Amino acid sequence: MSWSFLTRLLEEIHNHSTFVGKIWLTVLIVFRIVLTAVGGESIYYDEQSKFVCNTEQPGCENVCYDAFAPLSHVRFWVFQIILVATPSVMYLGYAIHKIAKMEHGEADKKAARSKPYAMRWKQHRALEETEEDNEEDPMMYPEMELESDKENKEQSQPKPKHDGRRRIREDGLMKIYVLQLLARTVFEVGFLIGQYFLYGFQVHPFYVCSRLPCPHKIDCFISRPTEKTIFLLIMYGVTGLCLLLNIWEMLHLGFGTIRDSLNSKRRELEDPGAYNYPFTWNTPSAPPGYNIAVKPDQIQYTELSNAKIAYKQNKANTAQEQQYGSHEENLPADLEALQREIRMAQERLDLAVQAYSHQNNPHGPREKKAKVGSKAGSNKSTASSKSGDGKTSVWI
């Protein structure tokens, strides 16, 4: 018997199962397929040829063997393996079809994109080039990146390991997986009950037959009954082990789903304000470690040429000169009155200085007065010269 086709299918199921499902698959291949193909064929090859009855009545021996074994043990176990593996094979076909469809849809979406770019952050250099202060600008801005480069980076990063349950859920195969698991469990229970009613737990060394055309009750003898009994008990144990693995896998899926839901709720409670504000990729932000400072209006992020920068600088200088020229033309009309008030304040200050010096040095009033007079004259001449030039600066 060739098992290569079924074995290849079951190996493909190994890639779309949980770790409990992988254990079940190992038990199915090693203990069921190998034991049935190797041990069963060698043990039960002579079950009918060595079935001997103590009668010479034609046809009596065949009728008695049919009563002893309505279905051959090996054929029963082969039929059991095929039916138990059928739900898994159907699940595999559905999974391959759905995954291929999803990949095809993703490929179409990527091909339909007119601008296959992704966002990444880069330091803004346009403003720095115009300032010419040789200082780094901490502000960061998004830059477009090719989607292929992003995919290469994602492929280079190792994927987190898991037991297969999350992969099944992400692919949308959880319902089909649970359905095939239930069908597999039902088949296991059905074949376990059928094996008990057909063969029991022991292969007896002889069998009493009274069917027609046997003239009376006759005794029939079975070859190697002890060996066949041991093999029968082994197959009972393998069936029970597969049934326990199915139950364990269902519990694993149930508790794993509950644990994931509880963890997601706990993360939401721990970080309630994670999504309370709108997020946009176009908003500039500073990297960690930089102090936020108010900056002038940002120049639009473009690679400005030297000609454009020079043109903008000349335009700004011209506007500044025009602004300062207009300020000089709009001097106040009462400039002379302001100068008179300044001279009067200067005279009062001189008188106060003379009085103070007269009190402290009464012997030299003339010398002080002469010095003060010369100083006042020089100040007046300076003020008159400044007013004549039309400047607003006044020397005191």
Curated annotation (Swiss-Prot):
Regions of compositional bias (Basic and acidic residues) in chain numbering: 147-156
Compartments, record wording: Cell membrane; Cell junction, Gap junction
Chief location of this protein within or outside the cell: membrane
One GO CC term on file: endoplasmic reticulum membrane
Location of region: Disordered: 145-165, 353-396
SMART domains to which the protein is assigned, alphabetical: CNX (SM00037), Connexin_CCC (SM01089)
Residue numbers on the Cytoplasmic membrane side: 1-22, 96-175, 249-396
Alphabetical GO biological process terms: atrial cardiac muscle cell action potential; AV node cell to bundle of His cell communication by electrical coupling; cardiac muscle tissue development; cell development; cell-cell junction assembly; cell-cell signaling; chemical synaptic transmission; gap junction assembly
Highest taxon above the source species: Eukaryota
Keyword DNA damage annotated: no
GO MF term set: gap junction channel activity; gap junction channel activity involved in AV node cell-bundle of His cell electrical coupling; gap junction channel activity involved in SA node cell-atrial cardiac muscle cell electrical coupling; monoatomic ion channel activity
Protein topology in the membrane: Multi-pass membrane protein
PROSITE patterns: CONNEXINS_1, CONNEXINS_2
Composition bias, Polar residues: 376-387
InterPro entries, alphabetized: Connexin (IPR000500), Connexin45 (IPR002265), Connexin_CCC (IPR019570), Connexin_CS (IPR017990), Connexin_N (IPR013092), Connexin_N_sf (IPR038359)
Transmembrane regions: 23-45, 76-95, 176-198, 229-248
Extracellular topological segments: 46-75, 199-228
Record keywords, A-Z: Cell junction, Cell membrane, Gap junction, Membrane, Transmembrane, Transmembrane helix
Database matches in Gene3D superfamilies: Gap junction channel protein cysteine-rich domain
Record-stated family: Belongs to the connexin family. Gamma-type subfamily.
Subunit structure: A connexon is composed of a hexamer of connexins. Interacts with CNST.
Function field: One gap junction consists of a cluster of closely packed pairs of transmembrane channels, the connexons, through which materials of low MW diffuse from one cell to a neighboring cell.
Protein name: Gap junction gamma-1 protein
Source organism per UniProt: Homo sapiens (Human)
